[in-house]
């Protein structure tokens, strides 16, 4: 009698298990497959470039990531994602440039730029960091700064910063990388800590939206500008050749190759 009860109990348990398995299969068969395109899916770290050699000290901040060049005392590159929501920030602009506490070795101070003839040129702009007090303050670390021609800093470079915020509002977000270019033409240093003056600057911007996909490369000589932004346009491939960096490598290869070889004639 005891064995019969055990068999009945086992049979009931097995039947319940079979019912659960069948129900699970039926429910999952009704789930639609994911069809989101690459442009619609967020890709973490899309803006972080890959250095082919001579990678600097990586420093991650609230609003950006940079690779610091201890030899030239400037960043190699600064990268960040700017979203539509972040462009709505109301945080007041900081005015205090400070040494970066996380830089290893010699730290650049604001006085290195005093009476140098060059601006303290932001790479990741303060205007992109208004969404966070901490992000705003960190944008004034000297590791995010390069000696920059005053007219370039306040005019064409600034115009591209404003245009980038416009694209972020229009397309939801943009991925940005910028930094100095040293070509060995200029052998100029400023300040007690010998900050090297860049020959030029680059900026690459990725718009990866279902409505618009493009990668823009910009090349600026470190001199007075006041020219249309279209005149600074080049391909991202050209910037990669100049810098030895691989941009937007998280994109599928075919898409990356197509976007990065194109030189746009007009801005989005």
Question: Where do the PLM segments sit?
Answer:
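Domain-level detector for secreted/extracellular nuclease and nuclease-toxin modules, and
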Residues: 2-268
């Amino acid at each position: 009698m005891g064995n019969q009860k055990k068999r009945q109990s086992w049979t009931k348990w097995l039947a319940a298990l079979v019912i659960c398995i069948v129900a699970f299969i039926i429910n999952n068969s009704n789930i639609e497959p994911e069809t989101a395109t690459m442009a619609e899916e967020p890709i973490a770290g899309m803006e972080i470039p890959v250095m082919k050699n001579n990678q600097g000290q990586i420093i991650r901040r609230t609003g950006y990531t940079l690779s610091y060049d201890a030899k030239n005392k400037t960043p190699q590159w600064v990268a960040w994602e700017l979203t539509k929501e972040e462009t709505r920030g109301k945080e007041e602009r900081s005015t205090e440039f400070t040494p970066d506490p996380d830089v290893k070795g010699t730290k650049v101070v604001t006085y290195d730029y005093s009476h140098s003839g060059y601006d303290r040129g932001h790479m990741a702009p303060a205007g992109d960091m208004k969404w966070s007090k901490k992000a705003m303050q960190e944008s004034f670390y000297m590791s995010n700064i390069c000696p920059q021609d005053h007219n370039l800093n306040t005019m064409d470079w600034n115009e591209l910063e404003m245009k980038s915020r416009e694209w972020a509002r229009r397309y939801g977000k943009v991925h940005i990388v910028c930094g100095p270019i040293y070509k060995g033409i200029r052998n100029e240093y400023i300040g007690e800590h010998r900050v090297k003056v860049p020959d030029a600057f680059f900026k690459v911007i990725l718009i990866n939206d279902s409505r618009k996909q493009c990668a823009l490369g910009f090349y600026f000589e470190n001199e007075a500008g006041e020219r249309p932004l279209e005149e600074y346009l080049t391909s991202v491939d050209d910037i990669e050749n100049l810098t030895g960096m691989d941009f937007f490598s998280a994109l599928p290869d075919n898409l990356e190759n197509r976007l990065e070889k194109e030189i746009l004639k007009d801005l989005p």
